[in-house]
């Protein structure tokens, strides 16, 4: 299966998934959503709308909102921005981020920015499984400085692939949001993957598709976009991975490899 990913038309398949996930024909979207809930064990009791037939299309279900109060926001300085599992975390040594045992990639490659290679001290990589809540929230109070769309591959980001393919996160398509906080600049990296139909933010809307072949930078210094800890910042329209990069003056991370997190839970 790993080798097959190099042969598959990754972007074509993701575009097809984008269209399929927006089919509004009731029997198609309801049957597929019902299968998905059963296959992946989605807890619909948490959803604000529990009736799967009430969703406009599959993507509407996939990016569903939760009932009020289910994700309380911790008083700690930094919270988990998503529901998911910690696939890696720790210190960034010599500007290298651990991907898996024996594999790493550079900060500059991930961000497509050599000037930020030595800007961060620690990281957390959080994998969102198909059953998870797929909205992304602010890990702390911050002001949006800039955002960068970086084109790339669309390899799967499941653990088997991450353990097998070098530099997956710095090779895959990604969207990087830079925020100024009380303890310095943080980066929230949304990593795309095969079948991730699109990524979107609250301030720009849908970023992909269309897919481009060049890096695109968005500057926000004059717009004063301020977000509070726990505010929604974006969504995966089909899921993937979020990487959080923290600066040297940030509180220390207090999470473990393999730990399951809920959005709003303290990570420091």
Regions found by a protein language model. Give the residues of each.
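Contiguous, well-folded functional domains in the mature portion of proteins
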Residues: 1-268
């Amino acid at each position: 299966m790993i080798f097959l990913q190099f042969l598959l038309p990754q972007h074509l398949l993701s575009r097809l998934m984008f269209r399929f996930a927006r089919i509004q024909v009731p029997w198609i979207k309801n049957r597929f959503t019902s299968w998905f809930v059963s296959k992946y064990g989605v807890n619909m009791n948490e959803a604000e709308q529990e009736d799967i037939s009430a969703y406009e299309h599959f993507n509407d279900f996939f990016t569903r909102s939760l009932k009020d109060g289910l994700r309380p926001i911790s008083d700690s300085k930094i919270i988990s921005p998503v529901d998911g599992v910690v696939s890696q975390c720790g210190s960034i040594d010599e500007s290298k981020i651990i991907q898996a045992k024996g594999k790493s990639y550079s900060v500059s490659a991930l961000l497509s920015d050599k000037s930020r290679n030595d800007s961060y001290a620690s990281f957390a990589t959080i994998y969102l499984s198909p059953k998870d809540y797929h909205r992304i929230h602010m890990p702390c109070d911050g002001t949006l400085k800039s955002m960068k769309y970086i084109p790339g591959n669309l390899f799967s980001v499941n653990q088997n692939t991450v353990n097998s393919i070098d530099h997956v996160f710095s090779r895959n398509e990604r969207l990087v949001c830079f925020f100024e906080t009380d303890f310095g600049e943080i980066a929230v990296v949304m990593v795309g993957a095969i079948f991730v139909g699109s990524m979107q933010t609250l301030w720009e809307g849908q970023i992909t598709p269309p897919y481009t072949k060049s890096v695109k930078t968005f500057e926000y210094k004059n717009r004063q976009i301020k977000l509070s800890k726990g505010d929604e910042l974006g969504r995966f329209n089909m899921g993937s991975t979020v990487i959080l990069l923290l600066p040297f003056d940030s509180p220390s991370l207090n999470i473990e490899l393999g730990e399951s997190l809920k959005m709003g839970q303290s990570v420091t």
